[in-house]
UniProtKB/Swiss-Prot annotation:
SUPFAM superfamilies found in the cross-reference section: Metalloproteases ('zincins'), catalytic domain
Cofactor note: Binds 1 zinc ion.
Annotated compartments: Cytoplasm
Species of provenance: Prochlorococcus marinus (strain MIT 9515)
GO biological process: rRNA processing
Superkingdom of the organism of origin: Bacteria
GO CC, any one term: cytoplasm
Cofactor: Zn(2+)
EC number assigned by the record: 3.1.-.-
Primary role: Single strand-specific metallo-endoribonuclease involved in late-stage 70S ribosome quality control and in maturation of the 3' terminus of the 16S rRNA.
Pfam families per UniProt: YbeY (PF02130)
Protein name: Endoribonuclease YbeY
GO MF annotation, one: RNA endonuclease activity
Keywords: Cytoplasm, Endonuclease, Hydrolase, Metal-binding, Nuclease, Ribosome biogenesis, rRNA processing, Zinc
Amino acid sequence: MYQKDNASLQIDLVFKCNDFSNLSDPFLYQPGNLIFESSFWEEVLLCWINIILSEKNTSFPNFIFDKKIFSLSLQIINNNEISSINQKWMDKSGPTDVLSFPMISDEDTTKNLNFIELGDLFISLEMAFQQSLEFDHSIKKEMLWLASHGFLHLLGWEHNDDNELDNMLNFQEYLISKLD
């Protein structure tokens, strides 16, 4: 896994994973699988933050580059929950794979602080599982894909056209490749 100067950076992660033991597919929820552990996501997110800060990618607001503590929440939820959130906040019906609610604005409201609150990230485990089957890869890879997409949105990355989307998807692949 990519390592730089982890000692100077911190991640403040509020992590929640629903109990999926009652789902019909036993391969969907396997206790002990790292994707259900807070420590796994802390390490992944810290790695990605290190990469982003070291490369000073211009797709992100300048003020994130002097922060040392990054705070966010990540919840792994079911289709019913993500459908409810999708309807309430996005005015869209039905489940989706990932939702992110960034707290970053174009202005730095944390100028004199060394931390930043990024926002909230929700991933539907059921959608991730369906997509992992559709794309013929592991649930872990799909969860990393969805988390990277939502995480980039939390950092202010948008995709308003095909070119921006392609750039974002390529950067997601790059971030995930650095975890190996």
